[in-house]
Amino acid sequence: MAFKKMVERLTRPVEEIDREQLTAFCDARLLSAMDAIHARERVRVGGEVRSVRIVPRAGAPALEVTVSDGRGSVVGVFLGRRKIAGLSPGRRVAFEGVTARDGKRYLVFNPIYELLA
């Protein structure tokens, strides 16, 4: 049995293993699955920060932080901010707020955020 698990771990893609571990991490913290959220509902989602970028919105800067839980992704938009300490790619974070739909992606404007270990 141990040999079978070792062979399975060595032959599976690293991305698949990382995705499963991230999904288990989010499930253990009772965060909503990102593939099950809908627009205009209050959610608490979390995962790993995939990207951080500054985008001009209505003439003012906005920090967009994309977070993925292995099943989907949500973009946290912090209006009027250029950076937030602790929010960098690879960190794990939870967002809480009301979702909005922008094309195919979900946004949470000025979410309450919590850095996770």
Predicted features, each with a name:
Residues 38, 81-96:
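Short nucleic-acid-contacting surface segments enriched for D/E, G, S/T with interspersed K/R
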Residues 52-76:
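OB-fold (S1/OB) nucleic-acid-binding surfaces
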Residues 1-46, 50-56, 101, 106-117:
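OB/S1-fold single-stranded nucleic-acid-binding modules
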Residues 43-45, 63, 93:
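Hydrophobic core residues within well-ordered beta-strands of beta-rich domains
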Residues 67-69, 74, 82-83, 94, ...:
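Amphipathic, hydrophobic secondary-structure cores in small proteins
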Residues 77-78, 110:
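Residue-level recognition of conserved beta-strand positions in structured domain cores
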